UniProtKB/Swiss-Prot annotation:
Residues 115-447 form the Peptidase S8 domain. May be involved in the degradation of proteins for nutrient acquisition or possess a regulatory function by proteolytic activation of proproteins. Residues 19-90 form the Inhibitor I9 domain. This is Putative subtilisin-like proteinase 1. InterPro entries: PCSK9_ProteinaseK-like, Peptidase_S8/S53_dom, Peptidase_S8/S53_dom_sf, Peptidase_S8_Asp-AS, Peptidase_S8_His-AS, Peptidase_S8_Ser-AS, Peptidase_S8_subtilisin-like, Peptidase_S8_subtilisin-rel. Its EC number is 3.4.21.-. Pfam families: Inhibitor_I9, Peptidase_S8. It comes from Encephalitozoon cuniculi (strain GB-M1). Keywords: Disulfide bond, Hydrolase, Protease, Secreted, Serine protease, Signal, Sporulation. GO terms for molecular function: serine-type endopeptidase activity. The keyword Hydrolase applies. It is found in: Secreted, Extracellular space.
Length: 465
């Protein structure tokens, strides 16, 4: 009797998922050194991966890879890795409801019969057929990136100021199939519905036609903005150097630029170099870049870290608090400390019933029954913190039209300029008084910080006199 021994190949199936890996890189490093470090980190990360695991999306300071939980744990222990986070779903923060003025020598423009949200941000007392006052040239020279479902860039509201930036949704057309992104863009920079009237709108598609997506796509969108921001920074430096040379400056001075706002020269400081520095100082060397994130999902450390990283490069972020009627600190990007997080307020200056709250919310802005642009060249009324955040994005662009604030400074300025309105609602929506703040005069009464550009308007008037 022959005993046949059969050797069986046992295949162990390990569950793999998409993980976001962020490197512990300093954004102030010069680009050459950062590139070397990044390539080295990628090489070492690939050595950690198993043969059936792979890196998919690469970003400025990290990547997305399909790997097992055990590999992710090993990756976390690498000294160059800041964090490893499982990719997670995100979606729009909007709730659907189907239902210009004249120049002044003061530098202020009035739009009559403006949408109530604009009137409120401009400080108008009458919100019914109210007037919206805003600085002349508001938004000029500012690029606002709308990371969303896309933007209908041909919509009449944008008057040629909108362009397509990038599309990170696989197998989807380069257009807004939903309407949410177009609505947000209209609140930011529409000629009738916008807080600013001259800002440039750049569409970055990270959500599909259903308003859904993944955190990894958002990170790709942020990475795209970083690359465009750094490219514009180089262009500004080159323009400043050209201005110096055209004014008779020495052409034998070699400038070494590392992507930051500092220079190193190949020869000691001389009067000619000082003239170059003076020429450069007359330029706004930091591009004026704003990102609107009217999206949300559960708190994600990788997304918050990416926003902080980009903010350190000079990019301003406005995020929606979310519509769960819960603590905004439990969601991203609303929990980001580097962004300005906006909750939704009503025309009665109360917190909208759906808005998230808590200490992570910096200001409240109009978010109920907001009229703005929609796909198909139409307009629509929509509610949500998705509509509140674009009011803040527009305000950021308005401030940047006149002042060169870095993100931290401007966040403090906008919070400081907010109007503190007594909350008359009976809904104890957070139950902790973490936010809104108790009144200094009556601890039983709460104050809502409502987004307002009144103080900016006063500064512009004084500046124009």
């Amino acid at each position: 009797m022959i005993l046949a021994i059969i050797s069986l190949s046992v295949v162990i199936c390990r569950e793999v998922s998409d993980y976001i890996v962020m490197f512990d890189q300093d954004p102030s490093m010069d680009r050459a050194s950062m590139k070397v470090l990044y390539n080295m980190n990628i090489h070492e990360a690939q050595n950690i991966l198993r043969p059936d695991e792979s890196i998919g999306i690469k970003m400025t300071n990290g990547f997305v890879a399909r790997m097992s939980e055990s590999t992710a744990e090993r990756m976390k222990r690498h000294p160059s890795v800041k964090m490893v986070v499982k990719d997670s779903p995100v979606g729009i923060s909007g709730l659907k409801f189907d239902v210009p003025g004249s120049d002044d020598r003061s530098g202020i423009v009035m739009q009559r019969h403006a949408p109530w949200g604009l009137a409120r941000v401009g400080g108008s007392v009458s919100l019914v057929h109210g007037n919206y006052c805003y600085p002349i040239n508001s938004g000029k020279g500012v690029d606002v990136y709308v990371l969303d479902t896309g933007v209908e860039i041909e919509h009449p509201e944008f008057g040629g100021r909108a362009r397509w930036g990038a599309n990170f949704v696989p197998k989807s057309p380069d257009r807004d199939e939903h309407g949410h992104g177009t609505h947000c863009a209209g609140v930011i920079g529409g000629k009738n519905f916008g807080v600013t009237k001259e800002s440039s709108i750049i569409a970055v598609k990270v959500l599909d036609k259903y308003g859904s997506g993944m955190t990894s796509r958002l990170l790709q969108g942020v990475d795209f903005v970083i690359k465009e921001h750094e490219k514009k920074k180089d262009e500004l430096y080159n323009a400043a150097a050209d201005e110096y040379l055209s004014s008779g400056g020495s052409s034998d001075i070699e400038i070494e630029m590392d992507g930051s706002e500092s220079f190193s020269f190949v020869q000691p400081e001389t009067p000619s170099i000082q003239r170059l520095v003076d020429a450069i100082s007359r330029k706004a060397l930091q591009p004026k870049t704003v990102v609107n994130l009217s999206v949300g999902g559960f708190r994600n450390a990788a997304l918050n870290f990416a926003i902080e990283y980009a903010s350190r490069l000079g990019i301003h972020f406005s995020t929606a608090a979310g519509n769960e009627h819960e603590d905004a600190c439990d969601f991203s990007p609303g929990s980001s400390r580097a962004a300005i997080t906006t909750g939704a307020s009503t025309y009665r200056d109360t917190v909208a019933f759906f808005s998230n709250f808590g200490k992570c919310v910096n200001v409240f802005a109009p978010g109920v029954d907001i009229l703005s642009s929609w796909i198909g060249g139409t307009q629509k009324i929509v509610s949500g913190t998705s509509m509140a955040a674009p009011h803040t994005s527009g305000a950021i662009a308005a401030y940047l039209t006149y002042y060169d604030y870095d993100p931290h400074m401007l966040k403090s300025r906008i919070i400081g300029d907010a109007r503190l309105i007594e909350d008359v609602s009976e809904d104890d929506y957070d139950g902790t008084t973490i936010w809104p703040l108790p009144s200094l005069f009556n601890a039983n009464k709460k104050k809502l910080p409502i987004l307002s550009m009144e103080r900016l308007l006063r500064r512009v008037r004084n500046k124009m006199r």
